[in-house]
């Protein structure tokens, strides 16, 4: 430098991946059914601001999105593409980046605060991203010329931000954002939420159907296995039925892959004393502890507290402690024992905590480095794998027998979505659905992939019992360490609300889990008819909340509202 041979300069280098130039030649040509759906969407946008794309699994919805994004960019508009899970951004990012290059920005909570700030600043700059792909928080980014919002897998409950506040549903927020900016909204899914489908059926939204899979691939065959009967006849001991074991072996030996779905992580959901029935429970929450064999701890899945595994029952002194039920850890152990030659991976919250774990597990399975993938609901959310020929749903009953008015809807969605991972490009797939209730009407809908029949049954129930989409639902939660205090506070709140809302108020009541992190919980349900003045409702609720806070007896009681709960 002293001799003038080298020059120094300062340049600001951002954390963001700038990518390359967009290359629209890398887009795939739409098939006949896809092109027809694309044309119908564009036509619907002439009359409707929101359109629902109801396309079966593996029908090629993503490719339609890519063509819609291209059209928006060519019209000098920005696009927001929302996904329910960070895991889904892993597979879709490369597909979009190949086409849109540096015009694509990624935004989700796995990024550091500094990275997210840079994306925010870029969106406010003179050269923002044309396309933002992200999870629910991406809906809060600034857009100068938003033209299209795509909400993929719109039925997913993951779009609801629950805790901490602010509580919002990204789908509803996206629709409102589009309305405020003059943009169009496309909701895409194979299993629409009842609310969205009802809006489409009543003409509020446009509706476009894509009823066949890409390149004519058949929907998977679904076989129901009665595990109760198999256990009674002593033909099944572990979590996998003989039929499922045989089909998984056949898939692995034939160079194909299998997915096993168990929506429960850990080794076993319960430890129990054979002599007296004692079950270890969390000291801070009203729940039993889940055994995690990898860490040799019992863990609370609500507060995260970990406890040592007892060797002796503290209630009766017996050493006969055994586990009940099976989580993904136990399934993994049993599968590894049954198929020692197979390469097995597990995908749940425990295995995806570390940075890059999502990507590694998905990439290994997509590239054929894993033969059998065991997982929770993460594996049923729009992931696309070519070699999967067998899917096992190990416990359908746990999804159906849940105390919630959405239980059947959510169970159908989960089973249909997981089933859709089978038989994508290698012929028709097979789904083995294990249950103790083979005659349940819901399972018939799943086998026939008959969303219409499910919708007609559930919508009639919702109307009869005044549930969404025929009412607005609000839950009022009250929390305090002292159960007596929260009981009195909830009764006072309930009485106050009844003076204003009458029989629209239900409760207070104890929720299924009535204590979390040492706080006792009470819940009040508010059912409001459509068309009610929501501004006045908010005014009453805030007045009630303030009245409770001003009362010296209840000043320390936490009160919050969950509007349109999931």
Where are the model-predicted features located?
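Hydrophobic residues on short alpha-helical segments
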Residues: 38-39
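Short proline/glycine-enriched turn/loop segments at secondary-structure junctions
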Residues: 512-515, 549-550
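Short beta-strand elements
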Residues: 500-511, 553-562
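A short interface-forming secondary-structure element
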Residues: 481, 525-534
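Short, low-order "capping/linker" segments at domain edges
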Residues: 23-26, 515-527, 561-566
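Inter-lobe coupling/hinge segments of SF2-like helicase ATPases
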Residues: 25-31, 35, 47-130, 134-487, ...
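Interdomain "pre-motor" coupling segment immediately N-terminal to P-loop NTPase/helicase cores
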Residues: 1-20
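Short amphipathic alpha-helices in soluble, non-transmembrane regions
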Residues: 489-495, 535-547
């Amino acid at each position: 430098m002293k001799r003038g041979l080298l020059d120094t300069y300062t340049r600001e280098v951002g954390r963001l991946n700038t990518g390359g130039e967009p290359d629209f030649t890398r887009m795939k040509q739409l098939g006949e059914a896809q092109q027809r759906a694309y044309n119908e969407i564009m036509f619907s946008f002439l009359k409707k601001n929101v359109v629902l794309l109801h396309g079966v699994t593996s029908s090629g919805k993503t490719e339609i999105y890519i063509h819609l994004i291209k059209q928006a960019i060519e019209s000098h508009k920005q696009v927001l593409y929302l996904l329910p899970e960070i895991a889904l951004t892993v597979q879709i990012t490369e597909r979009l980046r190949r086409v849109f290059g540096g015009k694509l920005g990624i935004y989700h909570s796995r990024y550091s605060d500094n990275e997210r700030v840079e994306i925010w600043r870029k969106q406010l700059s003179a050269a923002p991203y044309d396309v933002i792909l992200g999870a629910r928080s991406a809906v809060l980014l600034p857009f100068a010329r938003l033209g299209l919002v795509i909400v993929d897998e719109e039925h997913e409950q993951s779009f609801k931000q629950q805790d901490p506040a602010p509580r919002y549903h990204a789908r509803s927020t996206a629709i409102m954002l589009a309305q405020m900016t003059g943009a169009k909204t496309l909701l895409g899914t194979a299993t629409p939420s009842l609310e969205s489908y009802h809006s489409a059926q009543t003409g509020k939204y446009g509706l476009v159907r894509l009823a066949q899979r890409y390149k004519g691939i058949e929907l998977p065959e679904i076989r129901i296995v009665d595990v109760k009967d198999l256990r009674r006849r002593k033909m099944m001991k572990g979590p996998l039925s003989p039929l499922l074991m045989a089909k998984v072996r056949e898939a692995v030996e034939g160079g194909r892959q299998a997915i096993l779905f168990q929506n429960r992580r850990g080794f076993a959901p319960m430890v129990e004393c054979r002599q007296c029935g004692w079950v270890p429970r969390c000291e801070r929450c009203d729940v039993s502890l889940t055994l995690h064999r990898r860490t040799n701890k019992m863990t609370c899945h609500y507060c995260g507290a970990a406890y040592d595994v007892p060797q002796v029952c503290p209630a009766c002194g017996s050493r006969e402690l055994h586990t009940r039920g099976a989580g993904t850890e136990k399934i993994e152990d049993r599968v590894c024992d049954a198929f020692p030659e197979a390469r097995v991976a597990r995908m749940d919250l425990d295995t995806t905590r570390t940075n890059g774990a999502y990507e590694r597990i998905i990439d290994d399975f997509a590239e054929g480095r894993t033969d059998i993938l065991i997982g929770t609901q993460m594996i049923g959310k729009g992931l696309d794998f070519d070699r999967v020929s067998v899917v096992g749903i190990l416990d359908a009953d746990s999804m159906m027998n849940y105390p919630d008015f959405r239980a059947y809807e959510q169970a159908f969605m989960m089973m249909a979505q997981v089933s859709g991972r089978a038989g994508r490009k290698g012929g028709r797939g097979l789904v083995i659905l294990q249950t103790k209730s083979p005659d349940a009407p819901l399972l018939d809908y799943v086998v026939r992939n008959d969303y219409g029949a499910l919708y007609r049954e559930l919508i009639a129930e919702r109307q009869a019992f005044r549930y969404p989409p025929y009412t607005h639902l609000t839950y009022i939660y009250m929390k305090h360490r002292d159960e007596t205090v929260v009981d009195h506070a909830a009764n006072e709140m309930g009485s106050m609300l009844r003076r204003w809302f009458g029989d629209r108020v239900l409760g207070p009541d104890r929720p299924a889990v009535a204590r979390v992190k040492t706080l006792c919980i009470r819940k009040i349900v508010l059912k409001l008819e459509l068309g009610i003045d929501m501004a006045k409702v908010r005014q009453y609720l805030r007045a009630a909340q303030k009245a409770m806070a001003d009362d010296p007896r209840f000043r320390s009681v936490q009160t919050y509202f969950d509007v349109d709960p999931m």
